[in-house]
Amino acid sequence: MEQYHGTTIVSVRRGNQVALGGDGQVTLGNIVMKGSARKVRAIYDGKVLVGFAGATADAFSLLDRFEAKLQKHQGNLLRSAVDLAKDWRTDRALRHLEAMLIVADREATLVITGNGDVLDPEGGIAAIGSGGSYAQSAAKALMENTDLAPRDVVEKSLRIAGELCIYTNTNFVIETLE
């Protein structure tokens, strides 16, 4: 059975601000199934931002598990991410989930993968999904050459990715923490 896939999620951190945004396109093969999906959310009483890319059902399953880990570890982002990655890597059922997450709070941004990786991205920029490379490149250039706020960098980066990646549209959801 073919999976739903394709998206762009990007996070930018500057000073005491962090923004996380994503597009709204859900694709099944070469068909756009939905253009307004919400793949970025504020969770844990608005203290943590999370964005996901990959197979939609898998991503929602991981999002639920990550929220449970945050509750268990009283909002400690790193411990929650490592605990989720460990389960994801070792659990037989979870091991087959095809998705990635970017999570962020006031102090850190992390990328969580199904390989058991918890990555702290360099330069305060993280991006995943089919248009992630485009968005990350655009965000890096904007961060190095402008004084734009993280939200504006995320929006412009997503717009560029949406113009280049066929699996990314320009219907964005952007969340911020200050």
Curated annotation (Swiss-Prot):
Residues at the catalytic site: T7
Keyword entries, A-Z: Allosteric enzyme, Cytoplasm, Hydrolase, Metal-binding, Protease, Sodium, Threonine protease
Reactions this protein catalyses: ATP-dependent cleavage of peptide bonds with broad specificity
Enzyme class per UniProt: hydrolase
Binding site for Na(+): G162, C165, T168
Location in or out of the cell: Cytoplasm
Membrane-crossing segments per the record: none
Pfam families named in the record: Proteasome
Activity regulation, short description: Allosterically activated by HslU binding.
One cellular-component annotation, GO: HslUV protease complex
GO MF annotation list: metal ion binding; threonine-type endopeptidase activity
Enzyme Commission number(s): 3.4.25.2
Domain of life per record: Bacteria
Keyword Metal-binding: yes
Main location: cytoplasm
Biological process terms in GO annotation: proteolysis involved in protein catabolic process
Oligomeric form and interacting partners: A double ring-shaped homohexamer of HslV is capped on each side by a ring-shaped HslU homohexamer. The assembly of the HslU/HslV complex is dependent on binding of ATP.
Function: Protease subunit of a proteasome-like degradation complex believed to be a general protein degrading machinery.
PANTHER family (UniProt xref): ATP-DEPENDENT PROTEASE SUBUNIT HSLV, METALLOPROTEASE TLDD
Family: Belongs to the peptidase T1B family. HslV subfamily.
HAMAP family cross-referenced by the UniProt entry: HslV (MF_00248)
Protein name: ATP-dependent protease subunit HslV
Protein source organism: Ralstonia pickettii (strain 12J)
Gene symbol of the encoding locus: hslV
